[in-house]
Every structure is written in C-alpha cells, then in structure tokens.
Design a protein with these regions (language model features):
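Conserved beta-strand segments of alpha/beta enzyme cores
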Residues: 38, 62, 84, 189-191, ...
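Structured catalytic cores of enzymes that bind and process phosphorylated ligands/cofactors
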Residues: 2, 27, 50, 63, ...
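Conserved donor nucleotide-binding strand/loop of the catalytic core
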Residues: 82-93
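Conserved alpha/beta core of the MobA/IspD/sugar-nucleotide pyrophosphorylase nucleotidyltransferase superfamily
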Residues: 2-21, 168, 174-225
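Alpha-helical elements of Rossmann-like donor-binding domains used by nucleotide-donor carbohydrate transfer enzymes
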Residues: 50, 73, 97-101, 129, ...
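N-terminal glycine-rich phosphate-binding loop and ensuing alpha1 helix
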Residues: 16-69, 75
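Conserved beta-loop-beta/alpha segment of the NTase-like Rossmann-fold superfamily
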Residues: 92-164, 168-169
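Short, structured coil segments at secondary-structure junctions
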Residues: 35, 59, 79-82, 186
C-alpha cells in the first residue's frame, strides 16, 4: 500500500539539522514506453510531486529539484511547493550531470541527500531514519540504505547522503567519478544503513513496475498535460 505523504506542515526548524535534499527529476523515462513516469499519479498527485512533498516535509531548507526532460510539465506538477528548481541543459548526458548541477545549486552545506524522483513508497520516517544513521557515519563517509540476505549485501537503495567532501569530488570529476563510481571504487567510504523499508528500494522504471506498485496500468489520461 502506498503511504499518504501529504503532511500539513514541515518538520524542520530554523536551525539546519538535516541534509539538503537534491531531487533528480530530469530523466527521460526511457523504459516507460512513452510515458513520463514522473507525471503518473501516486495517491492522486504526480509522482514527482508526491516525492517532493515528502522531502519538503522532512527538510529544513527547500529541496533543490533538477529538471531536464519535459521540464515545463514537471515544474507545473511541482507548483506551490517551496523548492529551488533548476534546469540541467545536459540532462541527456546522464544522471551524474544532474547530480553535479544539483550539488552546485545547493551550495555549501555539511551533507546532501541525493534522491530519485521515482520512489513512490519513500516516507518522511524513512528520510529521518537515514539521517539518524548518517550521524553515526565516519568523517567523509556516504550513508547508503542496504538490504542484506544471509549477511551479504543484496541491494543498495536510495536516497543516499553524501558529505561535503564527496560533493567536492563529484563536482570536480562528475563524468568519470559520480556517486556509483565513488561507491564502487571506494567501498571504505560506504556507511551501510541496514533497512528493509520498501521506501528505499521500490522504484518505478517500467509500466509493469507502476502496475505492481499501484495496481493500475499507466494511461495517457493519468499524466499532467
């Protein structure tokens, strides 16, 4: 069941306690058979709005949203939410260009939460648990949700939290490094957050995944015009 992530008020205070969220909403939904998955409905609103509301409720500062593909339509779906929206003109070059653009736009901070826009089950509680885990991480470590089977890593989840030191590395060499490269090449930098919460692992990349998650087949009438 998809949780209702429509809070009435933000949880943050004037003091910045949480990482700055960066929501990656520039992708082309290439496996969705012509649908822009970010505009398909979750709990009656476009998925990108659903996820943005979750991050906005958790964060102390307006999340940074990186737009790209169908930027006008996605921006319209986010109307009325306190966000910092930017457009990545290089979005077709891959996800890391959007990560870099978001990190630059976010400016200096202690930590950043890099979040995908197709996580329909992600909740404020998931974000808070990830943030709590990150406080136990070592200096310079990246906190990553992980699910284990038989004591072994079965899969990594999203969002992840990166510190300022990783931000500098990614901005300097995003094309060759990136979050995945940083994690694969430097496993010592990973601080694993063991969690079985579906919010970290259920994403929507295909029409079948949308149907499995919502119980509905995607339809052109569902998307925002």
């Amino acid at each position: 069941m998809i949780p209702d992530n429509m809070p009435n008020a933000k949880l943050g205070t004037t003091a910045i306690k949480h990482p700055i969220p960066i929501l990656l909403a520039a992708g082309m939904s290439q496996r969705m058979g012509g649908f822009n998955k970010l505009l398909l409905p979750i709990n009656g609103v476009p998925m990108v709005r659903h996820v943005a509301l979750t991050l906005a409720a958790f964060a102390d500062m307006p999340p940074v949203v990186v737009l790209g593909h169908e930027a006008k339509q996605v921006a319209a779906a986010l109307d009325g939410i306190a966000l910092t929206m930017i457009t990545n003109a290089q979005f077709q070059s891959g996800k890391m260009s959007s990560v870099k653009a978001g990190l630059i736009a976010a400016g200096q901070a202690a930590d950043y939460m890099i979040c995908l826009a197709d996580l329909p089950l992600l909740t404020v509680e998931d974000c808070a648990a990830l943030c709590t885990a990150h406080k136990k991480a070592g200096v310079g470590q990246i906190t990553v949700p992980v699910q284990r089977e038989d004591g072994m890593f079965a899969r990594r989840g999203n969002p992840i939290i990166i510190p300022a030191s990783a931000r500098h590395k990614i901005i300097k060499d995003a094309a060759n490094l990136g979050c995945r490269g940083l994690l694969n090449n430097h496993p010592d930098l990973i601080y694993p957050f063991d969690s079985c919460a579906d919010g970290f692992y259920v994403d929507i990349d295909t029409q079948d995944a949308f149907c499995d998650t919502t119980g509905k087949k995607p339809d052109a009438r569902m998307t925002v015009s």
